[in-house]
Amino acid sequence: MNHLVTASMVALSVATPIAASVAAPGAPHDKLVVGMTAFSSSQHPYIDPVIVKSWTLGFVNRPVTYFTPDTWTNTCALCTELPSIENGRAKIETQANGKPGMSVHWTLKPDLKWGDGVPLTTKDIAYTAKVGGDPTTGFPDARIWGRIYKTDIIDDQNIVVHIDEVTPLFNRMSKLLSEHIDGPTYTAAKSPGDYVKQNAYNRAPTTPGLWNGPYMMTANDGASQIVLQPNPYWSGSKPYFKNIVIRSIGDTAALQANLLSGDIDMIPGDGNGLSLDQVLAMQKQHPTDFNYIFNDSVTFYHLDVNLDNPILKDPRVRRAMLMAIDRKAMSDRLVGGRYQLAATWVPPKEPMFAEGIPIVPYDPAGAKKLLQEAGWTPGPDGILRNAAGERFSIEYDTTTELKLGLLIQQVAQDQLKRVGIEATIKNEIQRTFFGDTLKRRKYGGLAQYFWLFSVSFAPLQLYAISNIPTEANGWGGSNYMDWKNDDFERALQASATDLDVGKQKADWAEMQKIYAQDLPTLPLFFVPQTHVIPVWLKGYVPAGMTDYASLRGEDWRAE
């Protein structure tokens, strides 16, 4: 699972009518001001990954490979050819310890340079692999960089990396660190944690030699604003804007006010921006002042089910709970039908999506029947009881900050009560909910939040048995449900090692089938990204996943 897995939700706010201030026709647009609600003080590509930073770095630090926005297909950004078994660039080999591994031959495009004119070479790949494989550096991307145990530099453009496992992720390579700028800091680090604090990206983020994209970071006040300007050594399409300003504005109400007043030009939907309901209200009030884009995404909104609770161990009970919730009505009434109902965690646009997995329908009568089959019958107060007289009463948790989530929770609570299930709301601030309650399984029944997935990334972190948080593993992993399904585990582990695309799809289809039957989480919706951009901005193509629209920032222009 993911490198940048984000667990958060969008907030509800009532849009206040404000007259929109837009530039006069013919006015020059050589500056683009982007507004977000968050800011990252760290600019290191891997340490402390957050959405706003990754979105910003799309302009200035290009990965070796990325997924295209239209078909979500892995493709080269800095390389000449995507390695594969078929073209001979990837091979299975035997490691010195006798275990199978892989060798992968990468070739960088010619004329790549950092922002100071120094050539970008295979030394930068080797350096990034070295830092990424060091457990003291704080890299979360262990399955991308940590699996590389050796690099063989052939020349400045060619390198062979050796991977300690057989994995379908062999031909993915993310952002590179600048060896000639950042390397001395890593070499000088004397104790664990020194590099995390002193790396060049955090100390001097406006150093030109840190960046290899169409833009460079030329100003960073460390609190609320970053300025990007064209990289004179960029070898690709010439970027249009002289300045791109990324500005952090405290909350969504202020963000919207700044947009309507003209202080900012746009709010991206793949960053920390406006909620769906805010954008819908704004579109109604200002239909022609901006372009509004709603695109499918990998954002999976769901309810984790605590399987430590004996009441919730029966799959029939979990299915009945999902049948009791009218997800379509929620989507229609709260967000104008923009939520896409989910059958599993895999969205239809995902290349590994399995056709034929039915979406559990809203069927309260069927839910009552299933609950009765599972041994639950109504008590005198209307709440179900089992043969031992135990009431069907569970806790229902989400975060206090997210207003639209609270509305969804209230509707679901009421609908569950109609079939005899008492769901007691127990909400917490995000820091407590994500930092303690989920991973220690302190929630008593249901936990409502969303995940943002990477494309075709085997969901080991979420569903592998080894990723059930425990005291023994330092409460690591995100299988917060304590889900143990041997059939799913076999398909999951196979999906993480099968190189044949056909076999991978079969593995994923099996996982989706088992998930839909067992329902360790209750799938609710896929949440679309909502982008508000100026009518004069062209070339803006949102992706709906973690390879953000900024990765094609050189194509943005004003017309």
Indicate residue ranges for each PLM-predicted region:
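Alpha-helical secondary-structure segments
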Residues: 33-36, 121-128, 156-162, 213-214, ...
